[in-house]
Amino acid sequence: MHFNTLTCVLVGLVAHTSAVPTKREAVNSCLTQAKVPTDAQGSQSWKEDGTAYNLRLPFEPAAIAVPTTVAQVSAAVECGAKHGVAISAKSGGHSYTSLGFGGEDGHLMIELDRMYSVKLAKDGTAKIQPGARLGHVATELWNQGKRALAHGTCPGVGLGGHALHGGYGMVARKHGLTLDLMIGATVVLPTGKVVHCSKTENSDLFWGIRGAGANFGVVVELEFQTFAAPEKITYFDIGLNWDQNTAPQGLYDFQEFGKGMPAEITMQMGVSKNGYSVDGAYIGDEASLRKALQPLVQKFGGVQVTATTVDWMGLVTHFAGAGVNVNPTSASYDAHDNFYASSLAAPALTLAEFKSFVNFVSTTGKSSSHSWWLQMDITGGTYSAVSKPKPSDTAYVHRDTLLLFQFYDSVAATAQYPSDGFNLIKGLRQSISSSLKAGTWGMYANYPDSQIKNDRATEMYWGSNVAKLEAVKAKYDPKNLFRNPQSIKPKA
């Protein structure tokens, strides 16, 4: 009897309070009234748009807006602001920590992949919407005028998040990061107001979106200075038969060559339980590449270099991988993984630091049951375009570092990610970072690490630029509407 009475009381309370709409109901009603297209919860489109790339980190949005115009984006933002619902923009959805969803439940997610226009002007500038995926950007710039942008190699990655937080790829040392080629942008602010920014217009906002772009609003169009697509570009790889004794010196020699290598070379060291290998790209023909690589090949002891010269789209296709669609435009694009990743942007390492790293790889790494891998890119060096700007020139701060590591471990899509994977990836990173001085290293915002807390994350991603970013945040988003667990907070 007491149970029944309590049940009736609870039902009465529920009935009494249900007249007050929840934030979810309120924001969805607002979107409907504003005629903003949305995904109905439980629909096929909700399932497609609402399934995170990283299956380890699923989050449930309060609503999914699917705009096709800037006016609809503006109206959606106004709805989120009106009802106090945090907002996150999702371009391609490839965030390692599901930041397109907000990195937590309950956000208004603005799905931008229906906005993927690429327009090349006669003067070589391009206006591109954030939902354009990198392979589509490359294809359109090539088809419209044999032009190109510096960007990453995965064709399904959306331009928005990629360009607004860095954008490292196979011609970065010659042309810079994707954000280095940005000359302007159109942004929907937290009020719904649409503004333009460049070096001469809202310059503080333009500074902030080049490295920390998710923190201030929804960037609905990006403007770039493109370059003529190389007529000849050569991709290459170098097989290495190293062991625990020879790898430290080999890695050190690779680094030392990288310090002064020509800007035309962009290359990376791959490391896994299977060993070590180099791959990269050279702007030019095979004969010129082999001449440029000769000092490194001699250091490596006469290793075999495999090289192929292609045109720009040949390079894009090669690094996309076999059987991958290099021009994805479908809203039902469906790529997923179940993984944990981290990163390290580091100065030049000593031989002792490489020994520490190799010891970890050869013991804990090799004995692990995990299928981990890592990449060590030489992003800097005397002739690198990435290193030319000062750390304070853009919100992207890692201009003085030489190396960029990406650490990655994945399991089957249906598996529960095992807790020892976190320690493995952390151990790989700390085998290097533990001996580095504070302030000399950081982490890359496009390889976000879900296991670090907010203040530490902002310090790692944006370093000496955090204070200025907090001031810009306070000016443009004082109520912290655009937020996630690792975002910039408004300066008090």
Swiss-Prot record:
Its cofactor is FAD. This is Chitooligosaccharide oxidase. Binds 1 FAD per subunit in a bicovalent manner. It catalyses: N,N'-diacetylchitobiose + O2 = N,N'-diacetylchitobiono-1,5-lactone + H2O2; N,N',N''-triacetylchitotriose + O2 = N,N',N''-triacetylchitotriono-1,5-lactone + H2O2; N,N',N'',N'''-tetraacetylchitotetraose + O2 = N,N',N'',N'''-tetraacetylchitotetraono-1,5-lactone + H2O2. InterPro entries: BBE (IPR012951), FAD-bd_PCMH (IPR016166), FAD-bd_PCMH-like_sf (IPR036318), FAD-bd_PCMH_sub2 (IPR016169), FAD-linked_Oxidoreductase (IPR050416), Oxid_FAD_bind_N (IPR006094). The gene is chitO. Residues 1-19 form the signal peptide. It is found in: Secreted. It is an enzyme of class 1 (oxidoreductase). The FAD cofactor is bound via a bicovalent 6-S-cysteinyl, 8alpha-N1-histidyl FAD linkage. GO terms for molecular function: FAD binding; oxidoreductase activity. Pfam families: BBE, FAD_binding_4. The keyword Flavoprotein applies. There is a cross-link at residues 94-154 (6-(S-cysteinyl)-8alpha-(pros-histidyl)-FAD (His-Cys)). Belongs to the oxygen-dependent FAD-linked oxidoreductase family.
